[in-house]
Regions:
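Alpha-helical membrane-interface segments at transmembrane helix boundaries
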Residues: 2-6
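Small-residue helix-packing and pore-constriction motifs in hydrophobic alpha-helices
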Residues: 7-61, 72-82, 93-105, 114-160, ...
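Short glycine/serine/threonine/alanine-rich loop segments
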Residues: 63, 110
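Secreted/periplasmic proteins that engage bacterial cell-wall peptidoglycan
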Residues: 67
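Short, solvent-exposed hinge/capping segments at secondary-structure junctions
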Residues: 84-87
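Alpha-helical heptad-repeat coiled-coil segments that mediate oligomerization/polymerization in large
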Residues: 181, 185-188, 192, 199
Length: 219
C-alpha cells in the first residue's frame, strides 16, 4: 500500500510539474509575442538586430529576451527621437543602456527595477532617481548636468542635457571609468550568482520559444 501511495504521489507531482511548465510556457510565449510586436513597431527594418541583442541578453545582461525587450520598449520612442529616428543607432544605444543597467545592478548592489525606473525617468527628463545608480550623483537636474560635464572631461565629447542618447552615453562613460562596465558578462562565467541568473534567463527564453513553436537552438 505504501509503495502504491508513493507512486501515486510521484505521478501527481509529475503531472502538476508538467502542468505548471505548460502554463509557464504559454504565459512566457504570450508576453514574448507582445514584446516582439513592440520591437517591430518601434525599430522597423532594424528590429531583427534588437531581437538578436535580446536573444543574447541572458549572457550580456542576465535578462530573458522578453524582459530585455519590455524594458527597451519603455524608453525606445524617446531614444529614437534623440537620434533623429536612426533605428540602427537607437538599437545600439538601447543595448548599451540595457547592459549598463545590469552591470550597475551587479556591481553596485542596486535593484535592477530601481535602475530601470531611473533610466525610464531620464527618457521623460525626470532626474529624481539618478541617485539610484549609486555613481555619486544626486537626483536633480543639476546633478545630471554635473555627470554630463564629468563624462565630457573623460571622453572629450560634449553631452547635452535633455538628449537621451547623450545621457545614456555619458552614464556609460562614467561607469566605464569606475570599472563597472562588463560586470554582468564576467559574473555570468565566474560566479555562482551570475551563472544562476544567466541560466534562469535562458530557461525563460526556452519556455517562450516552446510556446511560439520556435526551434530550440543553442545560442
Amino acid at each position: 500500500f505504501t509503495g502504491k501511495l508513493v507512486g501515486t504521489i510521484k505521478t501527481v507531482l509529475g503531472t502538476a510539474a508538467i502542468g505548471k511548465m505548460i502554463s509557464d510556457s504559454v504565459n512566457a510565449g504570450g508576453a514574448l509575442q507582445q514584446s516582439l510586436g513592440g520591437i517591430e513597431t518601434l525599430f522597423k527594418d532594424i528590429a531583427d538586430k534588437v531581437k538578436t541583442y535580446a536573444a543574447q541578453a541572458y549572457k550580456t545582461a542576465g535578462l530573458s529576451a522578453n524582459d530585455y525587450m519590455e524594458s527597451t520598449t519603455s524608453f525606445a520612442a524617446s531614444l529614437l527621437s534623440s537620434v533623429s529616428q536612426d533605428t540602427d543607432a537607437a538599437a545600439q544605444l538601447a543595448n548599451m543602456a540595457m547592459v549598463d543597467m545590469s552591470d550597475n545592478a551587479n556591481k553596485m548592489g542596486a535593484s535592477m527595477q530601481d535602475i530601470q525606473n531611473a533610466y525610464q525617468g531620464f527618457a521623460k527628463q525626470n532626474y529624481t532617481m539618478l541617485d539610484n545608480l549609486k555613481l555619486g550623483y544626486g537626483g536633480t537636474q543639476a546633478e545630471m548636468q554635473r555627470l554630463l560635464k564629468d563624462a565630457e572631461k573623460i571622453s572629450g565629447v560634449k553631452y547635452d542635457l535633455g538628449n537621451l542618447a547623450d545621457m545614456y552615453s555619458a552614464i556609460h562613460v562614467i561607469q566605464t571609468e569606475l570599472d563597472i562596465t562588463g560586470t554582468t558578462a564576467r559574473e555570468a562565467t565566474t560566479t555562482l550568482t551570475g551563472s544562476f541568473a544567466s541560466m534562469k534567463a535562458a530557461a525563460q527564453n526556452v519556455l517562450g520559444q516552446m510556446a511560439l513553436g520556435e526551434d530550440l537552438q543553442p545560442s
